[in-house]
Amino acid sequence: MGHSVAGVCLEEPAVLTAFPSLLHPQDPPQQRDRILFVTAELSDFVKVGGLGDFSAALPRVLRRQHAVRVLLPGYRQVLERCSDLRILGSLPGRAAIPPCEIGLVTLDDGLEVMLVLCPLLYEREGTPYMDDQGNDWADNHLRFARLCLAAAEIAGGHGAQGWQPGLVHANDWPSALTPAYMAWNGVRTPSLFTIHNLAYQGLCDLQCSAELGLPDEALSPESMEFHGRLSFLKAGIAHAHHITTVSETYAQEITTPEYGCGLHGILKCKVEKRQLSGIVNGIDDSWQPHCDPHLVAGFSARQWAGKRANTRYVEERFGLEPGKGPLFAVVSRLVQQKGIDLTLEISDALLQAGGRLVSIGRGEPSLEKAMLDLSRRHPGQVGVHIGFDETDARRIYAGSDFLLMPSRYEPCGLSQLYAQCFGSLPIARCTGGLADTIVDGVTGFLFREETAQSYLDAVLRAINVYHCPALLNAMRCKAMAAPMFWRDSVEPYNRLYRRLLRNTAPAWRGVRP
């Protein structure tokens, strides 16, 4: 049953994540609706953040009840790993958007992935969004408009040898123009748009409208005009039949000026129309501490010896003095949003209280330098690696006592769920998905104020618990039992899909915030 919090219509909570290890028996094909899942990332091939994980996991669990195809740009690194690509058809260009072909590849577990093949736009060195120097591609508006236009045309029955979806699910700004192009093309297929991070809006100049082949109505505040620019994200919000976010609390937060990034007005209108809901992300089946092959040794809530073995690995790997107080971990991008500056601000007090700190991740150069400087000032107490390694990250979750997540905002967050699964108690700011997935004093520690003092108070509470082994183990056991898995929690999406498939009314349009 859905429920309402602070005026936001929310679906029943689900804990959802992202990884490709989920296979289910499927219903007979004739009973399954066709779903087109549009994304800029798929962790099987290319991943920048949580979107890649989400896009790999949700379509897989949805396949039990639906015939799902993922639509992804044909990046160079994707094509290099596709040996059995089959061309389905071609689509024309529009304005400055070049034509493309649509290819199909079937992954080992049966997931079907359609690729937008456009060498001019996608076959480059770098990430999906940036060149190898870390600069945004200057033609990103064209690159992702091509993805969105292809999705809209496939929804209209073109380019995929007759395969036509009954519902289109777009994700974040790179695919946000999909519901808009569908509306402008006269395609009445229902559309769902998931916001993973409202702060990334896909902005470009108004003059780009001609290159994108936009109708005049697109330039209005009721569509994608945003303070004198064009916003891909706003287009998705304005034209999709329903909007979801990746946690219930984040769905509430983005309707406020503090978190709404200038879009709180249109999002409030979505609430009034019951077209905004939150479904919490969660974790994949691979996060099982008793059998994870990445770990030095497995462990469980009944047998902790393996956790201690992972702690010893982390101590040796990061040059920490063994067995000297609680081990705090940072597994994160080193950016302001994640509150890394707050961790640096309290680090001396944390260390003076007997704590140790290990950090893995990369991000803003100034924060990378500050973390390295901290480790140099405190050899044996602080270990830092700039970069990311999946095996080391998992061993840090397993070997640490506490995970630090003082995020300024956090649409969902996955690290706190991974940590809980591995018996590391998260210390986090009470925002977004962190508020939805951590029970203060039970499965972790929460603080509300965005201040170093509030954060430090939570850290000191955690240190007090560390020195009470019975309480520490009780909290660890509860934390390890807390996270849910995709296989258990896909039903809110299934219910939402069924509702949208029953109602194909034209998308409601928002108002200027």
Curated annotation (Swiss-Prot):
> What EC numbers are recorded for this enzyme?
2.4.1.21
Keywords noted in UniProt:
Glycogen biosynthesis, Glycosyltransferase, Transferase
InterPro entries recorded: Glyco_trans_1, GS/SS, Starch_synth_cat_dom
Q: Which residues take part in binding ADP-alpha-D-glucose?
A: 47
Q: Does the keyword Transferase apply?
A: yes
Pathway of action: Glycan biosynthesis; glycogen biosynthesis
Recorded catalytic reaction(s): these are: [(1->4)-alpha-D-glucosyl](n) + ADP-alpha-D-glucose = [(1->4)-alpha-D-glucosyl](n+1) + ADP + H(+)
The source's superkingdom equals Bacteria
Which Gene3D superfamilies does the record match to this protein? Glycogen Phosphorylase B
GO BP, one annotated term: glycogen biosynthetic process
TM regions (residue ranges): none
Alphabetically, the GO molecular function entries are:
alpha-1,4-glucan glucosyltransferase (ADP-glucose donor) activity; alpha-1,4-glucan glucosyltransferase (UDP-glucose donor) activity
What does the function comment of this entry state? Synthesizes alpha-1,4-glucan chains using ADP-glucose.
Please report which protein family the annotation says this sequence is part of.
Answer: Belongs to the glycosyltransferase 1 family. Bacterial/plant glycogen synthase subfamily.
HAMAP family on file: Glycogen_synth
- Name this polypeptide is given: Glycogen synthase
Provide the species name: Pseudomonas paraeruginosa (strain DSM 24068 / PA7)
